[in-house]
């Protein structure tokens, strides 16, 4: 079973980094309503588009998701 996207993303946190994956990880870490237990692209993507309390470039999210799948 694959780790949840959130669990993987938290391994990418680097608060002083300007790398998009680190930025997203820090934003998600602060977001208490992020879906933490899913590995569904549809669920996470929909959350980022419609529900997140922050905005993030979804093209960058697609690239980050590909990195997640590769791990």
Curated annotation (Swiss-Prot):
List, alphabetically, the Pfam families matched: YozE_SAM_like
Protein name per UniProt: UPF0346 protein SMU_1621c
Q: Which organism is it from?
A: Streptococcus mutans serotype c (strain ATCC 700610 / UA159)
- Fetch the InterPro entries from UniProt: UPF0346 (IPR010673), YozE_SAM-like (IPR023089), YozE_SAM-like_sf (IPR036806)
Record's family? Answer: Belongs to the UPF0346 family.
């Amino acid at each position: 079973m694959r780790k949840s996207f959130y669990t993987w993303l938290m391994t990418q946190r680097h608060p002083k980094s300007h790398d998009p994956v680190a930025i997203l990880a820090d934003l998600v870490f602060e977001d208490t309503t992020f879906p933490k237990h899913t590995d569904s692209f549809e669920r996470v993507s929909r959350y980022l588009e419609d529900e997140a309390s922050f905005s993030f470039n979804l093209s960058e999210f697609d690239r980050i998701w590909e990195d997640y799948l590769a791990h």
